[in-house]
Regions:
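Soluble extracytoplasmic domains of inner/organellar membrane proteins
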Residues: 135, 142-143, 158-163
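A cross-taxonomic marker for long C-terminal extensions/tails that follow the last structured domain
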Residues: 224-242
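A transmembrane-helix-recognition feature enriched in membrane-embedded lipid enzymes
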Residues: 1-63, 117-118
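Short acidic-hydrophobic, aromatic-tinged amphipathic segments that line or gate anion-handling sites
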Residues: 64, 125-128, 222
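A cross-family acyltransferase "interaction/gating" segment
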Residues: 114-116, 154, 163-228
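Residue-level preference for the first positions of well-ordered beta-strands
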Residues: 75-77, 150-156, 186
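Catalytic core of membrane glycerolipid acyltransferases/transacylases, capturing the structured
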Residues: 21, 25-29, 33, 40-43, ...
Length: 242
């Protein structure tokens, strides 16, 4: 039934999703040119509010849970599992007051309405996976911006999306690089549940009626912890919560 209804409602979802990303491309441009980065960020937040709401057109339920008061006056590294591209709009919207940035493939900075503009000018890191020196340099620049502005970054240490929802081993690289420049960053694990089911049939049809959730897990400090311990604590916490 999820697949059958998906055939009916997926075109409606894509129509509205596409409308909003096209609408907000010139809005982002105007906000950035006239109001600078802060105005641009507000336009991106609003875009992702609308994108998240297009999920409801497929009968989805979306929940975000955070029982922990997170600081806004220091950098945060959100460490999350990754199940689909649909993970990202809710993260941008629900974490908006923490100025969450992302590490993205440089190829995405061209040709995608709204998305490419935000990746270019939103303050994240755009890396060439074939050029490790460029990738490290970009992440270090991001870490410097985090430290200077008390921004946060969302890291997907699995390195790729999980097609079946099962957790893949965590890699150290991105988190270790950020901590070199922002050693005072707080580590905050996030568990994402069931967004993989949304795309279990591929891009078409999307699955109807899935219950997706994003939950903040217990934060912890990096002091007196090795990188292996930091990643192990995060991986185990997310694994238990899945």
């Amino acid at each position: 039934m999820n697949k059958f209804l998906g055939y009916i409602f997926t075109p409606i979802h894509y129509l509205f999703f596409g409308f909003f990303v096209c609408l907000f491309h010139p809005i982002q441009w105007l906000c950035f040119k006239l109001g600078g980065q802060e105005a641009h960020k507000k336009s991106v937040d609003l875009l992702n509010f609308f994108l998240v709401n297009t999920y409801y057109l497929l009968g989805s339920s979306i929940s975000f849970k955070n029982l922990y008061p997170l600081p806004e006056n220091r950098p945060i590294i959100f460490i999350s599992n990754h199940q689909s591209l649909y993970d990202i709009p809710p993260l941008i919207w629900f974490l908006r007051k923490y100025h969450a940035k992302f590490i993205s493939k440089i190829e995405l900075t061209k040709g995608i309405p709204s998305v490419s503009f935000n990746l270019k000018y939103g303050g994240g890191a755009n890396i060439d996976r074939k050029d490790s020196k460029q990738a490290v340099a970009e992440i270090l620049k991001l870490a410097e911006r985090m430290k200077a502005n008390n921004w946060s970054t969302v890291i997907f240490p699995e390195g790729t999306r999980s097609r079946d929802g099962k957790l893949k081993p965590f890699a150290i690289g991105g988190v270790a690089t950020i901590l070199k420049k922002a050693p005072n960053a707080l580590i905050v694990p996030i568990v994402i549940r069931n967004s993989w089911k949304f795309v279990q049939f591929g891009a078409f049809p999307l699955s109807f009626g899935e219950r997706m959730s994003w939950e903040i897990l217990e934060p912890f400090e990096t002091e007196d912890k090795s990188m292996e311990e930091i990643m192990s604590i995060s991986e185990e916490a997310i694994g238990r919560a899945l």
